[in-house]
A protein has these predicted regions:
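Cytosolic nucleotide-utilizing catalytic cores of signal-transduction proteins
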Residues: 1-98
Length: 98
């Protein structure tokens, strides 16, 4: 069973609630920026160097954004036990066309 199948069973209202909890206080544009960052981060298997290159930002800028997301969400994408929550949020946001 894939994550897409599981998420397809979740009502849109619940998906929006989850996004709101993870990205509390963020504007739609800020959420889009975090989703882009997370998508590239996961595609590069957590490589700060590769992600920063793809985003055309310095590694320190990316680290700052990752730390900012940790402050907002309470989850650190660099920790395997916490990254799952952010991965699910990213997949939901992409499904909702953020």
């Amino acid at each position: 069973m894939s994550l897409e199948l599981v998420l397809s069973c979740v009502p849109t209202e619940r998906k929006n609630e989850y996004i709101g909890k993870i990205f509390k206080g963020c504007s739609h544009d800020e959420i889009k920026e975090y989703i882009t960052m997370l998508n590239l981060y996961f595609k590069t298997e957590g490589s700060i160097q590769k992600t920063s290159e793809l985003m055309y930002v310095h590694k320190n800028t990316l680290q700052y954004r990752i730390n900012k997301l940790k402050e907002i969400s309470g989850y650190d994408v660099r920790k395997p036990g916490e990254s799952a929550a952010l991965y699910i949020a990213m997949r939901i946001a992409l499904d909702l066309d953020y």
